Every structure is written in structure tokens, then in C-alpha cells.
Amino acid sequence: MALTIDRDEIIGTLKREIQEITDMQEFQNLKSKYLGKKGLIKSLMNSLKDIDDVELKKEYGKSVNELKEELETLFDEKLSELKEKEREEKEKKNWVDITIPGARRKIGKENLITKTRKEIEEIFIGMGFSVAEGPEIENSWYNFDALNTPEWHPAREMQDTFYLSLDKEKLLRTHTSPVQVRTMLKSKPPLAIISPGRVYRKDELDATHSPVFHQVEGLYVDRNVSVSHLKMYLEVFAQKFFGNKVSVLLRPSYFPFTEPSFEVDISCIFCGGKGCNVCKNTGWIEILGAGLVHPNVFQSVNYDPKVWQGFAFGMGIERVAMLKYNIPDMRELYKNDIRFIENS
């Protein structure tokens, strides 16, 4: 039995069908029709068993294989065409016009408390001070006794201090002065440090008070230190922080750990010292407390007060930030109001 293959008709039909292919699914269906397990080529190959003549069988098999190669070539070309089309469509879909202005990302801003703390640190570091830190949970000896604060002092009362034990030995520090005590106990004079950090007092939260706030305290120890040294350093700080035109005034006060003690005022930055509502028409605004280190404090840390003298000061970070940035309510510093943060 002799079989013939109409090669031209098969090729022509495939070319017409393949032209109509638009996606990969249609491509796979058509390829299976011709080259699949139940496709045309498989059917033609199965016809070999019906040919008895060996030479005719060889010739027929050769013709089928040649046809198969031609079909595969046509399918390969179409596959490349479809892949290129897919690539172009994907590029078109993902195309970005680089000439369009980009959307600027919002950049975070430091909270004013952090910003102010860094400003203060940079000023004092520039004057030769180093930064020291210590624990917020303190022992009463470091927080009170070593700082010449006797048991009868009002600061040690329950209504002012957060005690963590019934014997009042553990507490949340009420100032960062304990850091100064710890530093002096492990360091030999002379020294100059500032100790920034969180402190805790039993205050109601309002426009000017908070049970948790931030301080920067300073300590300078050397020979022959006097009030004039204290005032000089504070003037440099005030002028760098608030502006060159600021003057400093020391008013006598009382702190158990300094003698003499002072409240430190600056000339009003809002009226230039002429008098206004902010300074209550005095021309001066209080910014911190200071004084010469009490001899009893030096004795607590084994410094000889006859050889060494020093000055100490302490300021509320929130207070000086409120003054510098004209913020009327301390509570604004603790809110996450993005409008306030962006404008500060």
C-alpha cells in the first residue's frame, strides 16, 4: 500500500492558522493539533505500519520527518513573535515617563525636645564639657544624701518623689544630679560634664508642668573656681542658644547642693529687656538654677573642698525649648501632631 503526504497543503493551512494566533493559549492548542500526541504528525507516523514495502516505508518516514521539521520551524518562529509581543506589552505597561517630576518623600523631623537637647550638648561640648549619663531608677543616697539634701527637705516628701520601695531607698530620679555624683566617685578632678536625661516628679500635667520631663545639668570642678567662672560659662551658653544680644543675671536663691545658689535669668528675648507680658514687665526671664558646689557634696565623693571648687547648674529642656521656639504649652512637645512637628 502506498501513502502520500500533501506537504504544500499542510504547510499552507498551518501558515493561515498560525497567522490568526494572538496569545500563548491559542498557540499551544494549535501546536498540539499538529505536533501533539494525538496530532497530525503522530497520525502520519502511525500510518507507517500500513506500508509493506520497505523502501516506500523509508521514503514515507523521511517525508513525515521533513514535514515535522518544517512545522516545528513555523511554530518556533511564531513562538518568538509571541514572546516579543509579550515583552513589548509588558514594557509598555511598566513604562515610566522619567520626565515626569517625582513625588518627594516626606522626611521625618526630630522632636523639639531631642533637637534642643542636641543643641545644648553641642554648645557645652564646644566649651570642653563631656556628656555623662546614668540610671533613671536611683538609690536615695545618690539622689539626695550625697547632694546635701537632708531627710527633712521637702523634696524628699512622698508628694514630690516617685518612690519604688517602702523604705524609700529606690526611686525615680528627681534630677540628673546623681550622674554628677557617680562621675565624681569614679573620676579624679578636674572635670567638666553635662548630664542630660529624663527626670520624674509628682507634678500635674499642665501648660508648664509634667510628671516626666527632661533636664540638662552641668558640673565643672577645678582649682580656684568662682562665681565669675559660672557666669562666664552661662553667658556663653545663653548667647549661643538664644542669641548674641542676651544678657545674664544671677539672683540669690537656695539649693541644698550649692552655696551660694542662684536663679539664672536672661534678658527677655521677646521684648529685648524692655518689659512685656512674657517677662511680666521685668525685662528678665528665668531659665535655670545654678551655684557653687556645696563643700558637703565634695566630701560625699571624697573631694577635698579646700583644694577643689566647682559650679553646677541645671535647666529644663522643655522650658528653654518653649522660650526659644515660642511654645506656650509644654504639652505640645509630647503630642504627635504632625502639623506642629513640621512647623517647629
From Swiss-Prot:
* Gene Ontology molecular function, alphabetical: ATP binding; magnesium ion binding; phenylalanine-tRNA ligase activity; tRNA binding
Q: What is its EC number?
A: 6.1.1.20
- Which keywords does the record carry? Aminoacyl-tRNA synthetase, ATP-binding, Cytoplasm, Ligase, Magnesium, Metal-binding, Nucleotide-binding, Protein biosynthesis
Which PANTHER family does the record associate with it? PHENYLALANINE--TRNA LIGASE, MITOCHONDRIAL (PTHR11538:SF41), PHENYLALANYL-TRNA SYNTHETASE (PTHR11538)
Q: Which HAMAP family match?
A: Phe_tRNA_synth_alpha1 (MF_00281)
- Complex and partners: Tetramer of two alpha and two beta subunits.
The identity of this protein, by name, is Phenylalanine--tRNA ligase alpha subunit
